[in-house]
Regions:
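Extracytoplasmic/periplasmic solute-binding protein
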Residues: 649-658, 663, 685-752, 758-759, ...
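Extracytoplasmic/periplasmic substrate-recognition and gating elements
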Residues: 97, 297, 764, 806-879, ...
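Long, aromatic- and glycine/proline-rich binding clefts that accommodate carbohydrate-like moieties
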Residues: 817-821, 869-931, 959-968
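Glycine-centered hinge/linker elements that transmit conformational signals in sensory
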Residues: 748-778
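Extracytoplasmic "Venus flytrap"/periplasmic binding protein-like
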Residues: 573-642, 646, 670-678, 789-792, ...
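Hinge/lid segment of periplasmic solute-binding proteins
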Residues: 532, 536-549, 611-664, 685-689, ...
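Extracytoplasmic
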Residues: 20-506, 834
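Conserved N-terminal structural module of periplasmic/extracytoplasmic solute-binding proteins
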Residues: 22-24, 299, 383-385, 391-615, ...
């Protein structure tokens, strides 16, 4: 008997070992799409020169149904084509020889959703490489008016408006990873070029097929100056203030206030002066700012820029310099601005000799543009990003055998079971070591940036040299790979803050930028004394009843100063001029709302309150019932019916939703394809794929945390909440309950519905997912998704924006879709609980009609769209605003496919009522879950026991507020 068991054991081990080894052949062969770097290497021998062909847009060979001819108001392109968000246009072109060609597109940005225009470029019916699927065309922005001054003496930045104009741009990588434009292989003879829409409409005027040549060096241009007899000018100095920029590629590049330096122009020690531009908002490669200036005479000028790059310690930021739309010579491709804690005058010239590069300017008006580029760091970033992708693959392959927490004393024979592992580790150690050396040569020092690379290189070398130590080094390997991802993000960022630009004759001494000791001391003293008298909670204009002959509304907002300033600007632009109602906006911690209200010092309107607060205040007579206003039904139609549920009780509504968030299913396309797995449609499908993931030591992610805890761009931060969704993984339980067609409460909340068979089944399924299928309770969703340990997970849809910004190396490798559902009567029910903050009117409001006008204005489509666009323009795509206004969502910068998915999931949304005693529901559902998971107690009995406690508390609270209670 023992011999038979031993024989079976040997067979099982042999088969298991064979399967592992057999499934890992050629595992480090790149599976992702071809990138431009490798594409360029493939066709580098086919470079062309001196070629240019213009293709009018109207000569296309194919156009989808939505494409139409466009009447050009400027009369420049009479054969232009309008293309919508889901259109395709294709042209046939003939070239005389095989080769690599650049493509320039002349386009006109028509009104859309204020985001950049995205297209894919197909050559002969195929996407040539990954970057061709993410081509961006910038809109052009400028100030919507002059700088205004509020009644406190602070300057108010003008809103950013689009400046539509014809632009011709070379097709380039949207992430700025390459220092050259993208090029495309065209075979001799006929070819097709297609533009496929991804986001935003645009008008196409023409395409150009051309071959670019390098810019001449300054030495060559200088020789041409001499040959043409150009001479330097004398005694001319022109200052261009940074804040006076006339055009920019992003609405986030607006004028800023900097009072850290007494020599900033203009300056005030306390009040806001818009005196600089750029800063950390100007970090994204590809973004540009343009100024106009005029010179009094023709001749040669020097250029200097008073700027501060105080973010990237031990490194520099780069800018491409363009005069009148052209780079004057090669040295202008990447002007470097080294790290400095204060403003420095950076001369455009030879760094070693201090000799300025002179630029010839004709008398009259000119433009100067600075474009954010990676410069010499471009190849460093590209190579590192490629290495990170392979390191993640290596880590994932190791984890498939060892798990994420291996036994450090066990020899897993990884070098045998993962063919190519050692050579891959050695290769990456060498590559990253070389990158570190290249970076050191570029920045001229061995600082923290280099140390990250050197540490990772050494770690990889040790793992390759001593494979038996890999299990105990695995956690460090994961951390180092995560640090490398952060390193890439930080290296890609190229911030720069500009005070002013100098155009001067070579004989003119440049202005001093360093304040003397007396100026610094006086500045610090004034700023310190002002802090005792200046009220920083008030935003913008502050009004009294005498100013408008009406009592101003007092509105509280509990968010960041950026959000408050956007809102105040919008109030001054539209609400007050249209209604005549003045508003004093105060930036406070919304957590003090309750004590302030009890003390009789609360606001008229509160923005960004947690979803439980309208009901908490209403039950105590402190919130206004909004249904009393005649036009409430019209206002309510702005939202999905589920959005009003948390603020409703007994036929009354005490708040309006600001944002609405819900879960989506995120997945790694590359990993699921590699494992041969389909995206699950139901929870039964999820249960089927969990073993397939587990056998490779991967997990399905189902968060043990509440939707209400995700930010998703909400305007308010709020205080601790007692929302049902704020406790543990209750959102998962509610998802399973709602998908069974049941509600959480009976009647108007007189008792819970947790005794129903559907609730017991949902609770049992919820606990079994963690108990039987061992789903992790706690995890870092972003890093585990990025590293591939958790290739499929449920997350708030705001996770999309996070991945777009913080995991650029995964571009094109992931997607999101509807959450898994429960099949009932042949239909997959994908119901999901939703949550979000609200705005409400306090009962103590002095003028409730005026407060209602403000709330209507705030939740209107126009206001929500503008606020969301302004917020994203300032804080970036990661701060995309999840407005609850349905029409506003349709105007935010999602692609057509993304928007359709979000709206389909929203159609399944169900709100969670906030009833008296509701705080006990989430708390005890979480307690019941823990009892089952940690103490192995039976699910049914545990749920029913806690349900009795919950209902007792609900009864107590309903009696307190004189409401009907459940009969004993």
């Amino acid at each position: 008997m023992r011999r038979r068991m031993l024989l079976w054991l040997v067979i099982v081990v042999a088969v298991f070992g064979f399967e592992i080894q057999g499934s890992t052949q050629d595992i480090f062969v790149a599976k992702r799409a071809l990138d431009f770097h490798h594409y360029l290497n493939r066709y580098a021998h086919l470079e062309t020169s001196d070629y240019r062909m213009v293709i009018p847009a109207g000569t296309c060979s194919y156009a989808s149904a939505g494409v139409s001819h466009w009447e050009d108001p400027t009369g420049t392109y009479n054969n232009a084509l309008y293309t919508g968000e889901d259109d395709t246009v294709e042209w046939r072109v003939y070239v005389e020889e095989d080769g690599l060609y650049n493509i320039a597109v002349t386009y006109y940005p028509v009104p859309g959703r204020r985001s950049s225009i995205q297209r894919e470029i197909y050559i002969n019916g195929e996407l040539p490489y990954e970057e061709a699927g993410f081509i961006e065309f910038h809109r052009v922005w400028g100030d919507g008016g002059l700088v205004q001054v509020d009644n406190q003496g602070n300057e108010i930045r003008p809103s950013q408006v689009e400046i539509p104009e014809w632009r011709t741009v070379l097709v380039a990588d949207s992430m700025g990873t390459y220092s050259i434009p993208l090029s495309f292989y065209l075979k001799r003879g006929w070819n097709t070029i297609a533009l496929v829409s991804r986001r935003e409409p645009v008008v196409i005027g023409q395409l150009e097929i051309l071959s670019l040549t390098e810019h001449p060096s300054y030495a060559e241009v200088e020789a041409d100056y001499k040959a043409l007899g150009f001479s330097p000018t004398s005694d001319i100095l022109i200052k261009i203030q940074g804040e006076d920029a006339v055009r920019r590629s992003s609405p986030s590049l607006f004028p800023l206030n900097d009072r850290s330096d007494p020599l900033v122009e203009p300056y005030h020690h306390t009040l806001i002066r818009l005196n600089t531009i750029g800063g950390e908002r100007w970090s994204r490669p590809g973004d540009w700012i343009e100024w106009e200036f005029e010179v009094p005479e023709s001749g040669l000028y020097q250029i200097a820029i008073k700027a501060k790059q105080h973010v990237k310690r031990g490194s520099y930021s780069s800018r491409r310099l363009l005069i009148d739309g052209r780079v004057p010579f090669k040295e202008g491709e990447a002007v470097q601005f080294p790290y400095s804690s204060r403003y420095e005058m950076v001369l455009f010239g030879d760094e070693e000799t201090g000799t300025p590069y002179l630029v010839y300017l004709e008398k009259g008006k000119h433009t100067l543009r600075l474009e954010n580029v990676l410069g010499e760091l471009a190849e460093i970033v590209r190579a590192t990003q490629e290495s990170l992708y392979e390191l993640n693959t290596i880590y994932r392959r190791i984890v498939m055998i060892t798990s994420a927490n291996p036994d450090p004393m066990r020899d897993y024979r990884l070098e045998e079971r993962i063919p190519g592992l050692i050579s891959a580790l050695e290769r990456q150690s060498r590559i990253i070591g070389e990158i570190a050396e290249d970076l050191k040569a570029i920045i001229g020092e061995s600082g923290a940036q280099v140390a990250v690379l050197e540490q990772l290189s050494r770690s990889l070398w040790l793992m390759a040299d001593r494979p038996f130590t890999i299990p105990r080094r695995l956690a460090a390997f994961r951390d180092n790979a995560g640090a490398l991802g952060t390193w890439i993000l930080e290296t890609r960022e190229q911030p720069l803050q500009i005070d002013y630009i100098v155009i001067a004759s070579p004989n003119v001494e440049l202005p001093k930028t360093k304040p003397h000791v007396g100026q610094v001391m006086l500045h610090e003293l004034r700023a310190f004394l002002s802090s005792f008298v200046y009220d920083y909670t008030l935003v913008g204009n502050v009004y009294s009843a005498e100013d408008f002959q009406v009592e101003p509304l007092r509105v509280w907002i509990g968010s960041g100063r950026d959000q408050a300033q956007i809102l105040k600007l919008m109030i001054e632009d539209t609400f007050t001029p249209e209604t005549g109602i003045p508003v004093n906006l105060e930036l406070i911690n919304i957590g003090i709302l309750l004590p302030a209200t009890l003390a009789g010092r609360g606001p008229d309107v509160a923005l960004g309150v947690q979803d439980t607060q309208p009901m908490d205040f209403a039950l105590r007579g402190a919130a206004v019932d909004l249904t009393q206003f005649p036009d409430f039904p019209e206002v309510a139609e702005r939202f999905h019916p589920s959005a009003l549920v948390p603020y409703s009780f007994g036929g009354s509504v005490y708040g309006l939703p600001e944002t609405q968030t819900f879960s989506m299913l995120f997945y790694r396309k590359d990993i699921l394809e590699e494992l041969g797995l389909e995206v699950p449609q139901t929870w039964d499908d999820v249960i089927k794929i969990i073993p397939d993931l587990n056998k490779d030591h991967m997990d399905f992610g189902l968060p043990y945390s509440g939707i209400a805890q995700a930010s998703s761009g909400a305007i308010g931060e709020g205080s601790a909440t007692v929302s049902v969704l704020a406790h543990g993984g209750v959102s998962t339980f509610l998802t399973l309950l709602f998908q069974r067609g049941e509600d959480l409460y009976l009647g108007d909340g007189i008792a819970t519905n947790l005794e129903s068979e559907a609730a017991v089944q949902a609770f049992t399924q919820w606990t079994e997912l963690y108990e039987l299928y061992d789903l992790p309770l706690w995890y870092d969703a972003a890093n585990r998704f990025r590293m591939g340990e958790m290739p499929i997970l449920v997350q708030d849809f705001g996770f999309y924006n996070f991945l777009q910004v913080f995991a650029p190396e995964l571009r094109g490798e992931w997607d999101f879709t509807l959450i898994p559902g429960t099949e009932r009567d042949g239909i997959i029910d994908r119901s999901v609980p939703v949550s979000g903050p609200a705005c409400m009117i306090l009962s103590a409001a002095r003028n409730k009609e005026h407060a209602w006008e403000f709330v209507k204005w705030w939740t209107s489509t126009e206001t929500q769209v503008r606020f969301g666009q302004e917020l994203e323009s300032i804080l970036g795509p990661a701060a995309r605003y999840a407005s609850a206004n349905l029409e506003a969502v349709s105007q935010l910068p999602w692609t057509v496919e993304e928007y359709q998915l979000l709206e389909e999931q929203r159609s399944w949304a169900k709100g969670v009522p906030n009833v008296p005693g509701a705080y006990m529901v989430g708390r005890h559902l979480d307690n019941a879950f823990r009892r089952v998971i940690y103490y192995n107690e039976p699910a049914r009995d545990t749920l029913l026991d806690y349900n009795r406690v919950i209902n007792e508390e609900i009864t107590v609270k309903r009696e307190e507020f004189d409401l009907e209670v459940l009969a004993p």
